[in-house]
Amino acid sequence: MFAIQPGLAEGGQFLGDPPPGLCQPELQPDSNSNFMASAKDANENWHGMPGRVEPILRRSSSESPSDNQAFQAPGSPEEGVRSPPEGAEIPGAEPEKMGGAGTVCSPLEDNGYASSSLSIDSRSSSPEPACGTPRGPGPPDPLLPSVAQAVQHLQVQERYKEQEKEKHHVHLVMYRRLALLQWIRGLQHQLIDQQARLQESFDTILDNRKELIRCLQQRAAPSRPQDQA
């Protein structure tokens, strides 16, 4: 959008246009394929502009908040030079941007860092096994056979101790039973001896009683004939 500067003819649309009725000179294309009336009016991306002064935004004379804006380059040799459209880039900043963009390494360019990083990080680029995936079997540990033998030896000792305890318990029970049987037999012998003694005592008592009865009968027999006489 451009603002119409005061003093321009109604028929002219851009700065530097000739008034109506005048013959226009032969138009020649510039390097940007734009047909312009003069060399100064050619849009050469402002090459050759003195001072490369930044354009200044100027409002129209009506002071109304419109979108029409015009660029004014102070110090320009002629007023007929066409100002660039709104949003055009300054030619001075254009090479800097191009240079800054050139410093960024594109994917198609190889400045040596990509190959070196690939060579250095070749180990890291290889896929590493996940945490949950099982690793391959490592070298056998020489201590494992000795540990297994020690564990087996301990297990054998524990079993032997348990067997010895069971045997000791069985032997103890058998000894207790034998002792109990011997005690019972001893009691039986004692009982038999006591029964024999009692029988002898009873026999002695019976014999003594018989003797006493016989003696009493003999004493009573001689006294009876004397009484009859």
Curated annotation (Swiss-Prot):
Residues 84-93, 115-126 have a biased composition (Low complexity). Pfam families: DUF4653. Disulfide bonds: none annotated. Residues 1-144 are annotated as: Disordered. InterPro entries: DUF4653. Residues 62-71 have a biased composition (Polar residues). Belongs to the UPF0500 family. PANTHER family: UPF0500 PROTEIN C1ORF216. This is UPF0500 protein C1orf216. The gene is C1orf216.
